[in-house]
Each structure stands twice: as C-alpha cells, then as structure tokens.
Amino acid sequence: MFFAIPQALSFSLFGIPMFGVDTCGFNGNTDEELCNRWMQLSAFFPFYRNHNELSAISQEPYIWASVIEASKTAMSIRYSLLPYIYTLFYNAHTTGSTVMRALAWEFPTDPSLASADRQFLLGPSIMVTPVLEQGASSVNGVFPGLAHGEIWYDWYTQSAVTGVSPGQNVTIAAPLGHIPVYVRGGSVLPMQEPGYTTEASRNNPWGVLVALNREGAASGSLYVDDGQSLTPNATLEVELVVADSTLYVSTRGTYVDHNALANVTVLGVGAAPGNVTLNGQPVQSYARYNSSSGVLSLTGLNNLMSGGAWVQDWMLKWG
C-alpha cells in the first residue's frame, strides 16, 4: 500500500491515467487493518478494485465488520464525486491532463513538495492524506499553498483548516476507518447522490459543492454524456463560476440530462446572507447557514427548475 501512491503518480506521468492497484494486496494474506486502510485509500484512485491470488485468504470487504464500514464511507464519497472524476477523465482524454496528481504538480513553486508522495490530489480540488503505517491513529501531512492564500476545507466537517503555518507538517487525527480528505478553496464540484452502482448514481439528483477561496471566488466544470457509448452522439459541458456571492452556471451541448438539482452547499461564507435567490426568485426558505462552520446549505431544490439541473443557464445569488 505504501508504494501504491508513487506508482500511480508515475503512471500519470506516463500518460496512463486509468491506473489502480490490487487493493488489500495480491500476494500473501492481508489483514483487517491493512484492508481497512487500503479500501479507503483506493477509493480515491482512478481505478478501484479489490483483487488477490487464489492461494491467499479471502479479502472481500464484507469479511470484516470494520472494513465494511470503512469501505462504505469511502465509496460513498467516491460515488458522489463520479461526475467530477468523469470530467477529469474527459479532460485527460482531450487535453492530456492528469487525473491523480502529485502535490508538486499543482504547486510547482514550492520545493518542499518535490518528494511528497504520501499525499496526493484527485484532480486539482481533492487532497487525500492516507494512513500508510501499521497501528497508526494519526498521519502527518502538509497543506500546500498556504503562503499564497490557499484555503483547504475538511471534507467531513466542511470547515476551513485553521491554525496551520505554511510548510508546517501537521499531525492529523485518523483513527481506523477514517481517511482525511480536503477540498481546495476556489473549487466548484458538481456531484450526484451516490447509488449502489455507477448506473444508479447517474440517475440520481445533482448537487453542487462550492469551496470559496480568500477572494470569495471559485470555478469548476462538468462533462456529461450517456456514460456508455464509445463515441457519444451528444455531449454536454457545464461551466460553474462564483464571483461576488453569485454562482453562475452556463451550459452548452446537445445532451439532455433530466436529473434535478437537489442541493447547493457553499463553504467559507463569512456571514449569514440576508437574501438568497435562484434566477431572481427568492429561495431563502430553502437555505440554512451554520455560523460556526461558515457553511451555507440549500436543500430540497428538486422542483425549482423544470427539466433538470443543466437544461438551461441559471444563477444563484446570496448576500
């Protein structure tokens, strides 16, 4: 498991973005702790499978109760991020960009990251800091870009990481079953409610996660097609941009996705907004603001836009 990250990053450099390892190990017998940690780590790799030789013991996630729960947690995150991951693969196919990335590739001016291979990025927006040592309940990691105003948000609490100095190697709590994941400020992540299969997930409502940077801005993109055809007859591209407390969504393409927009979550909102509108119409009753975490959540939006989340351009404003 320790060598899985540098191996994956090497294949990214080789121009082979669809890479994964034999999760829980291939040769010899695994154990509960190793499989627990590895099932969570591999959930953030481009290719994800559990596989071993016939002579080894069974290592399906359901063999151990703790691995079941750890796998469900990580796979739920992976499945909710499938639209983001699919878009990363589209960009890799069309532009040669990478899916799994070393910290140094995104922050090339920081020489301290040149040999960092215990953390990695999934695309530009998701940072993963896994436990790679037996018996550990914490892990050391850095938060790159802090010297230049970068913000990182904890995936689970949705709060901004604070109290960390630029370049500081921080000890992060990571009990068995928990893998630290962070969202980069300045990102907009289109997501879908996770289903039991990728096909089921593709038919679920949409959500948008906005992580504001220090200037209150963010951006992201989405690529959608039928998910099956080798040469799609119709495609859809969506641009999502945040400026001046407004999320602007613009679409282009001929593919029609009828799944509704269910929720929008904005991280890093400094104060409770006095007014929230969707395409100029008040939606304040759908909004909740958490002053301690700085999170603005809008839920239950399913019936507000007829036809689907991406059938037309739209604008969400708070302030």
What is the predicted function of each stretch?
Residues 181-281, 290, 300-319:
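Accessory, solvent-exposed terminal regions and/or long lumenal/extracellular loops of proteins
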Residues 136-138, 161-164, 168-172, 191, ...:
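A short local loop/turn or secondary-structure capping micro-motif enriched for an aromatic residue
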Residues 1-179, 183-184:
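Catalytic-domain carbohydrate-binding cleft regions of carbohydrate-active enzymes
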Residues 153-176, 277-301:
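Solvent-exposed beta-strand/loop surfaces of large extracellular or lumenal domains
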Residues 127, 139, 245-247, 296:
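Hydrophobic residues embedded in beta-strands of well-ordered beta-sheets
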Residues 117-118, 139, 238, 274, ...:
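Residue-level detector of beta-strand structural context in well-folded domains
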